[in-house]
């Protein structure tokens, strides 16, 4: 397969971080703290060539990463209690307005870069991720589209769609000159159950019409779409090989002396975000 030019990938030197390899294992709040940290760390890395970060932060423990709008639900405590009853943890993420589900069948990937060295408009940044995922699906004979699936959870203009069904979504965060574009991909597992979980959460939390009315039928997994067995690790390796076609990936160092103090600070911010949710449940009158 002949691959097209991809300047965003080829014109960066990429550091590669995989939270699955971190010892000890990282909780969801720490993975989110690294998302916050990388866009602040990037200015320390820039040299003659633009520097970027590829961050895989898939979360095995069943977890819902809630968005800022979710935190304003009228009966948030009841919604969070519902998630707990279903065996799910939760955290408040720094990007994206609404919640997404994480489990062993979901792949999370972030691309972080510095706008000073590679300027991107908001739409253009989203389109880099769409292009990457689209190329990764070509060997499966799948064509990726990007448009909003309104009845999915966390609907957005750049929903990742195959055959009319959503397989993933993209969020974006900017801090000064730092940019992170993050995507989740439903690689395998029970996507209908994930959608039903989010529908139940919004119902329990008293969501009004400004929140999605989640319909499981509008979402699917990559494995179902391609009609063959596929797991998260296999698909992640395929993404790594694809990126490596354009530019070498260098293993990142979680203990980099410039990164550690940034992460230490951002970890406290991330923990505080999630603790604010936990306090909602603990403050319920019947708790």
Per-region residue spans from a language model:
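Local beta-strand/beta-hairpin segments that build beta-sheet-rich folds
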Residues: 17, 167-168, 218, 222
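Aromatic/basic-lined ligand-recognition segments
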Residues: 164-172, 180
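N-terminal lobe of the biotin/lipoate ligase/transferase fold
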Residues: 1-120
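Beta-rich nucleic-acid/ligand-interaction surfaces
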Residues: 146-167
